[in-house]
């Protein structure tokens, strides 16, 4: 898929956040690439299109964050978002692949639509939270498995990707190797050492987001440490 191990930076600025506004995501992405990022992840159609137009010549993971009243699933949760993402031509489309109740179509229906309508270069990434999610995503033939939602679901809220010397990541890696799937470590890799560890353990790529591109998160980490 990709010949070398990649370091992705997630560049997102959502409505209500201080950095939300025109061209901000492109500037964040440019700064990330100047610092060594080899791939990008972003949300919302206008940002995806802007990064594609910027022609950074790196792989881009695109998502749409959309809340629905009857479900906790918000990362590219329905066919509506999938159709929009395919249309952008973004190389990697990531969707929530957890086994939680979805707002509309089933995960199977969304995946089936992707494989029937995708552009030839497009790949599908499963944002997972548990081993059950991973096994189901492999059964559905996702191209890429991500640990993105570990710690961000009700069932995994007391766990993280870095717990017990990266035990979850190691378990997912074994499954991915057995099934010849590309593994992206994402979710809570908030230090350079965490990111290096993920790649050293065997992940094909690592995504770092808040710890690089969200000043409020970085400031909060400092503040809490200072006041602990």
Curated annotation (Swiss-Prot):
It is an enzyme of class 5 (isomerase). Keywords: Carbohydrate metabolism, Isomerase. GO terms for molecular function: N-acylglucosamine-6-phosphate 2-epimerase activity. Its EC number is 5.1.3.9. Pathway: Amino-sugar metabolism; N-acetylneuraminate degradation; D-fructose 6-phosphate from N-acetylneuraminate: step 3/5. GO terms for biological process: carbohydrate metabolic process; N-acetylmannosamine catabolic process; N-acetylneuraminate catabolic process. It catalyses: an N-acyl-D-glucosamine 6-phosphate = an N-acyl-D-mannosamine 6-phosphate. Pfam families: NanE. InterPro entries: Aldolase_TIM, NanE, RibuloseP-bd_barrel. NCBIfam families: PRK01130.1 (NF002231). Belongs to the NanE family. Converts N-acetylmannosamine-6-phosphate (ManNAc-6-P) to N-acetylglucosamine-6-phosphate (GlcNAc-6-P). This is Putative N-acetylmannosamine-6-phosphate 2-epimerase. It comes from Mycoplasmopsis pulmonis (strain UAB CTIP) (Mycoplasma pulmonis). The gene is nanE.
